[in-house]
């Protein structure tokens, strides 16, 4: 790590380069994603097999948000995703890999984006998800038994998108989520765990799907999220951590679900997001000057969509998909 990097780590923030981009380089990012999809012999592509379906969702969603989905290889991608389906009803990250809730949701989202969800078996998928709900209302991500509030959102989102939400024990799921609600207004991975921006997104998203946002103090949760903004304008995941462009999405989307987007400095936030763009290769990095990747690219673009960038499709804050492709699957939220 450079001396400047050590200083950034010590003060838990970064400086934005003076020559940072001051607008969204949308076409450059679309080229970055398109090349990433086509360059299947690259080291980074090969080493990402363990999360391939999630990576496909990130790339496809970034292109859909950028109004350039037609550049993607629809038939090839849909067939690959369908090839990740297992006999238990779930989807793995790649063909031959075990099923997991994270990849099952990403598979469903990708098929919806390509208007191919009818090729999936909604009943077997929802039964797979139902089988991972525990007696206390929580969900395991797979048969390994790991419990995490991320998996509650994955479960409710998957079944909602398939029109099978009633398959799950929603009351029990909500009770578990509320056991993870901390006095500071945040949520952790499990009861008693530290509050984290990503977990807040998962929990408020799940509560919104369940129609139970009234269970929490929205202002208190929004205030915890607002304090994640650093002097650079970026957002971090929890106190004393560096800002990261992916939290632009987790925090902003949570605030949007809560109806509290005005709790942060949007102009400063946009400057940070713009500064995380690679103006040579395209794509977004976690922080200015780092290497771009599809994960940070989709969430950087999605965050800018939440701010109303009219060059982008409008994004749904719960599902991180375009409102256009969701149609009547969007969740009504009342404030």
Curated annotation (Swiss-Prot):
Keywords: Metal-binding, Prenyltransferase, Repeat, Transferase, Zinc. It catalyses: geranylgeranyl diphosphate + L-cysteinyl-[protein] = S-geranylgeranyl-L-cysteinyl-[protein] + diphosphate. One of its GO terms (biological process) is endoplasmic reticulum to Golgi vesicle-mediated transport. Binds 1 zinc ion per subunit. One of its GO terms (molecular function) is zinc ion binding. The keyword Transcription regulation does not apply. Its cofactor is Zn(2+). The keyword Repeat applies. Zn(2+) binds at residues 244, 246, 296. GO terms for cellular component: Rab-protein geranylgeranyltransferase complex. It is an enzyme of class 2 (transferase). Geranylgeranyl diphosphate binds at residues 196-198, 238-250. InterPro entries: PGGT1B-like (IPR045089), Prenyltrans (IPR001330), Ptb1 (IPR026873), Terpenoid_cyclase/PrenylTrfase (IPR008930). Its EC number is 2.5.1.60. It comes from the Eukaryota. CDD domains: GGTase-II (cd02894). PFTB repeats lie at residues 74-115, 122-163, 170-211, 218-259, 266-312. Heterodimer of an alpha and a beta subunit. Belongs to the protein prenyltransferase subunit beta family. Catalyzes the transfer of a geranyl-geranyl moiety from geranyl-geranyl pyrophosphate to both cysteines in Rab proteins with an -XXCC, -XCXC and -CCXX C-terminal. This is Probable geranylgeranyl transferase type-2 subunit beta. It comes from Caenorhabditis elegans. The lineage of its organism: Eukaryota, Metazoa, Ecdysozoa, Nematoda, Chromadorea.
């Amino acid at each position: 790590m450079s001396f400047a990097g050590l200083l950034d780590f010590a003060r838990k923030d970064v400086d934005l380069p003076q020559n940072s981009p001051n607008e969204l380089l949308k076409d450059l990012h679309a080229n970055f994603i398109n090349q990433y999809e086509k360059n299947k012999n690259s080291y980074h592509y090969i080493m990402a097999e363990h999360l391939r379906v999630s990576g496909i969702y990130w790339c496809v969603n970034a292109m859909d948000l950028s109004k350039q989905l037609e550049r993607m290889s629809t038939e090839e991608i849909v067939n690959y995703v369908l090839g990740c389906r297992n006999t238990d009803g779930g989807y793995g990250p790649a063909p031959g890999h075990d099923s997991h809730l994270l990849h099952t949701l990403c598979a469903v989202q990708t098929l919806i984006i390509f208007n191919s969800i009818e090729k999936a078996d909604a009943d077997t998928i929802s039964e797979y998800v139902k089988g991972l709900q525990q007696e206390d209302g929580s969900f395991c991500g797979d048969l390994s038994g790991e419990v995490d509030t991320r998996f509650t959102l994955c479960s409710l989102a998957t079944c909602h998108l398939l029109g099978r939400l009633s398959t799950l024990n929603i009351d029990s799921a909500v009770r578990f989520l509320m056991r993870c609600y901390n006095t500071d207004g945040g949520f952790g991975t499990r009861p008693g765990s530290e509050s984290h921006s990503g977990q807040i997104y998962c929990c408020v998203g799940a509560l919104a799907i369940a129609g139970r946002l009234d269970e929490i103090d929205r202002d208190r949760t929004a205030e915890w999220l607002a304090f994640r903004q650093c002097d650079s304008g970026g957002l971090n995941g929890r106190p004393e951590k560096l800002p990261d462009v992916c939290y632009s999405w987790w925090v902003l989307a949570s605030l949007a679900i809560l109806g509290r987007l005005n709790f942060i400095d949007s102009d400063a936030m946009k400057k940070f997001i713009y500064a995380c763009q690679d103006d040579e290769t395209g794509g977004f990095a976690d922080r200015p000057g780092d290497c771009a990747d599809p994960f940070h690219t989709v969430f950087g673009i999605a965050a800018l969509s939440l701010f109303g960038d009219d060059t982008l499709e409008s994004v749904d804050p719960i599902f991180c998909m375009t409102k256009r492709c969701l149609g009547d699957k969007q969740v009504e939220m009342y404030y």
